[in-house]
């Protein structure tokens, strides 16, 4: 099991000193704050001022990108942008690992292909291509559009997750939060 801190919310960044005060040791720090415009709204652009945080060496730093819902309008070109951006973060800036977050994006305007399984398949294809491109990476992390049981009801039902299950490379690490966005515990029935 991995223990980490995900900076992926809409608020102030965690101060460096806070890492010293954590009650439990962590192995990973995920840099993906929603307010960083280069991770979401301007995700096709490379942030020339991007820097790793100064953290204890034992903590792996993961660069997280959240492509917006327009990703699939020109997926071949956008996949090229994505690989370039992730390469910059790993090779030039020195991040240890990478992640793609497809959570919190509006997927209702995709049209017919958003019908359940197809969207899961499309997300899996993107992750598989990134995984192949970064085959030397220890971990490729993924937060799907549906990342807990409470979100799996309604329009997507189980189709989206089925599309992922059938197509996603088994080496990609998936974020799953159990029954709810914040779950006290995750047991087998939550998986």
Label the predicted regions.
Residues 1-82, 92-96, 103, 135-136:
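Feature activates predominantly on carbohydrate-active enzymes
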Residues 6-8, 27, 107-191:
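Catalytic-core regions of glycoside hydrolase
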Residues 14-17, 48-52, 84-85, 156-162, ...:
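Alpha-helical scaffolding within the catalytic cores
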Residues 53-55, 86-89, 164-168:
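Glycine-rich loops and low-complexity Gly/Arg-rich segments
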Residues 75, 81-110, 114-116, 122, ...:
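Hydrophobic or amphipathic alpha-helical targeting/insertion segments
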């Amino acid at each position: 099991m991995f223990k980490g801190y995900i900076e992926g919310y809409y608020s102030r960044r965690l101060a460096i000193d806070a890492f010293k005060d954590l009650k439990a040791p962590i192995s990973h720090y995920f840099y993906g704050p929603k307010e960083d415009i280069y991770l979401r709204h301007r995700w096709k652009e490379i942030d020339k001022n991007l820097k790793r945080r100064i953290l204890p060496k034992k903590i792996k730093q993961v660069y997280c990108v959240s492509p917006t819902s327009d990703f699939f309008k020109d997926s071949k070109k956008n996949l090229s942008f994505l690989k370039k951006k992730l390469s910059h973060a790993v090779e030039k800036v020195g991040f240890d690992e990478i992640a793609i977050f497809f959570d919190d994006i509006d997927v209702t305007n995709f049209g017919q292909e958003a019908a359940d399984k197809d969207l899961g398949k499309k997300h899996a294809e993107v992750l598989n291509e990134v995984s192949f491109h970064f085959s030397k990476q220890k971990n490729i992390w993924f937060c799907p559009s549906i990342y807990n049981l409470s979100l799996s009801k309604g329009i997507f039902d189980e189709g989206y997750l089925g599309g992922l299950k059938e197509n996603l490379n088994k080496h990609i690490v998936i974020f799953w939060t159990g029954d709810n966005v914040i779950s006290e515990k995750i047991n087998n029935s939550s998986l």
